[in-house]
Amino acid sequence: MPSKARNIAGRPIGRVETRDWIYLAIIIAFGGSSFAMIRGAVETIPPAVIAVSRLWIGAAVLCAFVVAKRRKFPKFLAPGENGPRLHRAWGSMLAVGVVGNTVPFFIFPWAQQYVDSGLAGIYMAFMPIWTLGLGFLFADESITPQKVVGFGLGFVGVVILMGPDAMSGAASASTLAQAAMLFAAFLYAGSAVLARRAPPVRPRVYAAGVLLCAAVAATPSLFFVDFASDQWSLTSILCVIGLGVFPTGLNAFVIVALIRRAGAGFMALANYLTPLWAVLLGAAIYAERLSLSTFLALGVILIGVFVTQRRPAPQSDLDNASLHPDSAAAHRNLADNAVDDGK
């Protein structure tokens, strides 16, 4: 018997619609463009400054949308048995912000000093695999044969895209750096599942809170950085602004919205297509050469995505109990915590 659970869009969970594919395409475009912008930013600006700046810019963009739409953030503190405590919504936003933004944003610049970008792309392809397992364990997202085969094909496609040189580089690259990249991919997956289980807060408000928390947590790192701001070029500054507005700010809202509509597993498919988009964008902007393996990888990845979505899997009612505003759990959360859902 099919599940009657419905998501925040008011439709059965597991049904992927046209808007979800549009959201996925936006995530891929923003995420893939970040590599080109990072390349321009790091030419004259320290990585830590880039990480903190893009978080604050992204938070400012989303907060501006929140104010323009006259939405409200939930109260920071909520009454508890032993006195005021951190509001449940803010606790969730803090966890997702630190786990999915602050820590990975610092891990990758450090690790890429010892691991080339091709190998980094392969390790990022572990994120959907982590998400598949974590979603099954903690978010009631089913594991089906179609998903296993599709996610496996997606991973193979990324390996083909990056080429044999990336795989051979694993032997000479720092073991600690490679482990750090795997851990960062795990954190991204964990943050996606945490966002899936978030209290019923509007996606725009939730995404703004996530970036605010991430920016605050990341800011102390600037005390240990040599700014050398007199060496910053206009191109690098514009790249940082672009990183903050698009891959960090607007992308955060789209990611949260897509996770709540279609699930963490579907959103994670972007990690298979983002490296491909980055390669194509690099060819367009930096005249990087496209090889036959690029088009072979495209075919394998697209087949993998098709297989994962060939037969939507039913989900349990628990999957979206805390996300659907009309659910009993949502009403209990709203009553207990006075979360503003933006209505």
Language model segments and positions:
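Transmembrane alpha-helical segments that form core, pore/gating elements
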Residues: 37, 62, 131-133, 137, ...
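Juxtamembrane helix-loop-helix junctions in multi-pass membrane proteins
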Residues: 29-60, 78-80, 110, 116, ...
